[in-house]
């Protein structure tokens, strides 16, 4: 191998004094130009080790070719990780907010097996115990799941809940000084496909957090710590509404049964 293009060996010269503490006695090294590639550096290191071997220095426990390979591979892995950490999603993705990804039909019952029933005149949902032939009163919902470019929570999934066969969607907004549950008509459902985090359309979103198999809580995305709930008693006059987690006499866990 010809190493003259990478270095020249000079014995006992004052210019190589800086290398005297790093090379075996009697050997000095002067780099003729700056290496510009990893290959040049590798050739230079291997050449130094072989020269040291030629002067009677054993390479047995010192730097070996496989050590150089490990060093180069580790360097490549470290460089890759740095690039990944420095990368960031484009501003357009960060501003996209919530994006709908899927939808399926479902029905909801509370922990006392009361079903949601639509009261058309009052435009409210009520929780009732249905038996036998009255089960057809049970409301069927279209549940839409959403994702965000940067996940807000790892244990919760944003969802929207619409009454099947209608333009009515559950929403949470303030009324009488407190968050309350409403049924709102959405004429253009395309508005719900992508929702900005700063938009008032966030009122249609709820964080579904699973607490068991098909058992979930539904927290308002607009008013954190406020959950969809039903009355603990079988009082059919009280609507499905919002409450805080620790509210007495309210049920906040629901079985969400998928139908397709």
From Swiss-Prot:
Highest rank taxon of the organism: Eukaryota
Subcellular location field: Cytoplasm, Cytosol; Secreted; Lysosome; Secreted, Extracellular exosome
Record GO cellular component, one term: lysosome
Entry-linked SUPFAM superfamilies: Cytokine
Tissue: All three isoforms are expressed in gill, kidney, liver and spleen. Isoform 1 is also expressed in blood. None of the isoforms are expressed in brain.
GO BP of this protein: cellular response to lipopolysaccharide; cortisol secretion; cytokine-mediated signaling pathway; fever generation; immune response; macrophage chemotaxis; neutrophil activation; positive regulation of cell division
InterPro entries tied to this protein: IL-1_fam, IL1/FGF
Miscellaneous information on this protein: IL1B production occurs in 2 steps, each being controlled by different stimuli. First, inflammatory signals, such as LPS, stimulate the synthesis and promote the accumulation of cytosolic stores of pro-IL1B (priming). Then additional signals are required for inflammasome assembly, leading to CASP1 activation, pro-IL1B processing and eventually secretion of the active cytokine. IL1B processing and secretion are temporarily associated.
The protein's assembly and partners: Monomer.
Family: Belongs to the IL-1 family.
Function of the molecule: Potent pro-inflammatory cytokine. Initially discovered as the major endogenous pyrogen, induces prostaglandin synthesis, neutrophil influx and activation, T-cell activation and cytokine production, B-cell activation and antibody production, and fibroblast proliferation and collagen production. Involved in transduction of inflammation downstream of pyroptosis: its mature form is specifically released in the extracellular milieu by passing through the gasdermin-D (GSDMD) pore.
Protein name: Interleukin-1 beta
Gene source species: Oncorhynchus mykiss
Protein's gene: il1b
């Amino acid at each position: 191998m010809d190493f003259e293009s990478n270095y020249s060996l000079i014995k006992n010269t004052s210019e190589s004094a800086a290398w005297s503490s790093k090379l075996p006695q009697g050997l000095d090294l002067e780099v003729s130009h700056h290496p510009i590639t990893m290959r040049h550096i590798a050739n230079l290191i291997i050449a130094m080790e072989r020269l040291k071997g030629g002067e009677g220095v054993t390479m047995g426990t010192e730097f070996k070719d496989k050590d150089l390979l490990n060093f180069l591979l580790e360097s490549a892995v470290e460089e890759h990780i740095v690039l990944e950490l420095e990368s960031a999603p484009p501003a357009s993705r960060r501003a996209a907010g919530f994006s709908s990804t899927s939808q399926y039909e479902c029905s909801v019952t509370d922990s006392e097996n009361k079903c949601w029933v639509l009261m058309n005149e009052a435009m409210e949902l009520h929780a009732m115990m249905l038996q036998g032939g009255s089960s057809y009163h049970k409301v069927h919902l279209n549940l839409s799941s959403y994702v965000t470019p940067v996940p807000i929570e790892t244990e919760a999934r944003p969802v929207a809940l619409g009454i099947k066969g209608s333009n009515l969607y559950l929403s949470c907004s303030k009324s009488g000084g407190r968050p309350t549950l409403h049924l709102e008509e959405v004429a253009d459902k395309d508005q719900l496909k992508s929702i900005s985090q700063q938009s008032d359309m966030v009122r249609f979103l709820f964080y579904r957090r699973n607490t068991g198999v098909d058992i979930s809580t539904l927290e308002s995305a607009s008013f954190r710590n406020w959950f969809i709930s039903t009355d603990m008693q079988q009082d059919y006059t009280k609507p499905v509404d919002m409450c805080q987690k620790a509210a007495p006499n309210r049920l906040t866990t629901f079985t969400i049964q998928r139908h397709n």
